[in-house]
């Protein structure tokens, strides 16, 4: 958004890019504590998608056992990027889940607690 400040956050994907060959639940990232930021946001950058359609979701949890959906990106069929806002506070643990029928999704997801 023009005029918006910098949003600091954390990468939820492994390394500079992550490649999922099919639907995957990634390992969670421990943020150390729950946060009650005023405007949490998630960021998706799809570098490539070999075939199919993928949906990328960010989930959060207070105990690293029971996760709930925090943010859902628009389904992707190729190279794209998107920023979505998430309501309310976010749990201590965050993870990325990919779903759909696809092959070789190369992507990056970041999350800012606001």
Q: Each PLM stretch: what is its role?
A:
Residues 1-114:
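Signature of extracytoplasmic/envelope-associated structural regions
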């Amino acid at each position: 958004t023009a005029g918006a400040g910098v949003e600091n956050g954390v990468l939820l994907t492994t390394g500079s890019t992550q490649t999922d060959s099919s639907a995957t639940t990634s390992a969670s990232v421990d943020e150390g504590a729950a946060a009650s930021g005023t405007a949490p946001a998630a960021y998706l950058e799809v570098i490539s998608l070999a075939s199919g359609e993928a949906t990328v979701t960010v989930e959060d949890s207070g105990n690293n056992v029971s996760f709930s959906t925090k943010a859902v990106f628009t389904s992707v069929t190729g190279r794209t990027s998107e920023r979505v806002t998430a309501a309310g506070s976010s749990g201590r643990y965050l993870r990325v889940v990919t779903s759909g029928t696809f092959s070789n999704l190369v992507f990056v997801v970041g999350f800012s607690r606001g």
